[in-house]
């Protein structure tokens, strides 16, 4: 009977027992159940080695973060207190017209500032890196710049006899020096050497704000502060004792265009002129930046369209694996 039942079973279901749940096929480990994906039970999840931080660890990290923030705040407060204890004042930030992203220098102010330098500052300070040709197209025409250069006698030579001679200035000449050498400059200014003003705005922290504040910041020394003879109190100058007498005051000169020469106006104009002297490419740099922004506005959409045209087909392409037959 058992042999007959087994024969009938093989006849109906086949030799491998296909169709019976749990029937295992020869040559396969685990039979049909080996093809099923393993299930992640709650017990299996709880046995994972990567668990979240505990409550104590969270509290410790929060405490460390609060301590770090408190230490940083204390350091900033102590640094500010030390800076506030200094007697030197930091210049405020003034609303200059050329501070805008696309704003240019005030060329009318540059012209007035050159007049201030020529009539007031050039008696002590040099500008070794600025020539008369640099003024052309900025604040003077070529004819006006030539006339300014011809007002100055420049030493040239040697001539055919081997001697130096004096000639009228040319556009290629640089601004004349007030002193022949640094020793003569110190001797004429009680031992102080007047700095060159060609790059003074870029060389001082605060730029034109510092120049304006220094020129308008002269005042009487506070009670208890004594200065030796020949020094003046200026809170914006390092050490507060400066050897330069107050160079400007109201009506120190008369502008050619009739602008009232108040102290603040004179300081503003000469600071703008020195700003241009330190960075003559200021307007050109911003003009090129504007052109680059316009070009980028045209190129970015074109680049995006080319990227979409190039990669949209590749991104939507599907790969199918076809096993060899």
Swiss-Prot record:
PROSITE patterns: CYTC (PS51007)
Entry keyword Transmembrane helix: yes
Annotated source species: Mus musculus
Keyword list, A-Z: Electron transport, Heme, Iron, Membrane, Metal-binding, Mitochondrion, Mitochondrion inner membrane, Respiratory chain, Transit peptide, Translocase, Transmembrane, Transmembrane helix, Transport
EC number, as in UniProt: 7.1.1.8
Pfam family, one: Cytochrom_C1
Top-level EC class as recorded in UniProt: translocase
Bilayer disposition of the protein: Single-pass membrane protein
Family membership: Belongs to the cytochrome c family.
Sequence ranges assigned to domain Cytochrome c in this UniProt record: 108-209
UniProt-recorded name of the protein: Cytochrome c1, heme protein, mitochondrial
């Amino acid at each position: 009977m058992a042999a007959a039942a087994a024969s009938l079973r093989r006849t109906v279901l086949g030799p491998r027992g296909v169709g019976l749940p749990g029937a295992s096929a020869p040559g396969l480990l685990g039979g049909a159940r080996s093809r099923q994906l393993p299930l992640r039970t709650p017990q299996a999840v709880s046995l994972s080695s990567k668990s979240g931080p505990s409550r104590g660890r969270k509290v410790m990290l929060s405490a460390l973060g609060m301590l770090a923030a408190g230490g940083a705040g204390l350091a900033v407060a102590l640094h500010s207190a030390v800076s506030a204890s200094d007697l030197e004042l930091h210049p405020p930030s003034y609303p200059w017209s050329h501070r805008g992203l696309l704003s240019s220098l005030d060329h009318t102010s540059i012209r007035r500032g050159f007049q201030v330098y020529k009539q007031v500052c050039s008696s002590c300070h040099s500008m070794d890196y600025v020539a008369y040709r640099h003024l052309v197209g900025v604040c003077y025409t070529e004819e006006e710049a030539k006339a300014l250069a011809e007002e100055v006698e420049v030493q040239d030579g040697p001539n055919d006899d081997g001697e130096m001679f004096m000639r009228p200035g040319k556009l290629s000449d640089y601004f004349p020096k007030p002193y022949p050498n640094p020793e003569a400059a110190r001797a004429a200014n009680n031992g102080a050497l007047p700095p060159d003003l060609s790059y003074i705005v870029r060389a001082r922290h605060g730029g034109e704000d510092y120049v304006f504040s220094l020129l308008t910041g002269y005042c009487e020394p506070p009670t208890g502060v004594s200065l030796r003879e020949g020094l003046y109190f200026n809170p914006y100058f390092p050490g507060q004792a400066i050897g330069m007498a107050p160079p400007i005051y109201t009506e120190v000169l008369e502008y050619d265009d009739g602008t009232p020469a108040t102290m603040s106006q004179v300081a503003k104009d000469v600071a703008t002129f020195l700003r241009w002297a330190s960075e003559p490419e200021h307007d050109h740099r911003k003009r090129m930046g504007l052109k680059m922004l316009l070009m980028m506005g045209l190129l970015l959409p074109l680049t995006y369209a080319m990227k979409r045209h190039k990669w949209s087909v590749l991104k939507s392409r599907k790969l199918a694996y076809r096993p060899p037959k």
